[in-house]
């Protein structure tokens, strides 16, 4: 829904640079979607290094990266159609709720959602499977048909792990092969 690649890449580059790595030598495209700690753990050996990189990323994302987002074409019209149909809509993102909420507000999408589901800052919920599981605890979903829509493999795997049907979209960052 949200084209966040410019801000995400900017923040990965910032964090890698602060940690002494050359960001131009790192393909960050595979880190669009997965949890931050997992992404940084691919490059740093210790938990302390991973946590420091996450901190650099988050500070820069809050100040700069979160404002470098835009909507993919057609998203607002799609959201209008879904809302007009009376569908319950929730997010299930690996971004922390505290991070995604201001982005949704800035992009004018916040009011479309009945529930903002996201990761927690303290790591207690930090992967797609757990985020979806948390969203599914909403009593308003009891007895409802649910469809997980996503653009990355972890979206599809999170749906499978929660025994949900899923629809892959290609307007985001995943490829047909990845799905």
Residue positions per predicted region:
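N-terminal helical cap/lid subdomain that shapes the substrate entry/recognition surface
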Residues: 2-77, 81, 85, 98-101
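Conserved H-loop
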Residues: 22, 110-114, 142
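A short, structured active-site edge motif that brings together acidic residues
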Residues: 27-28, 110-125
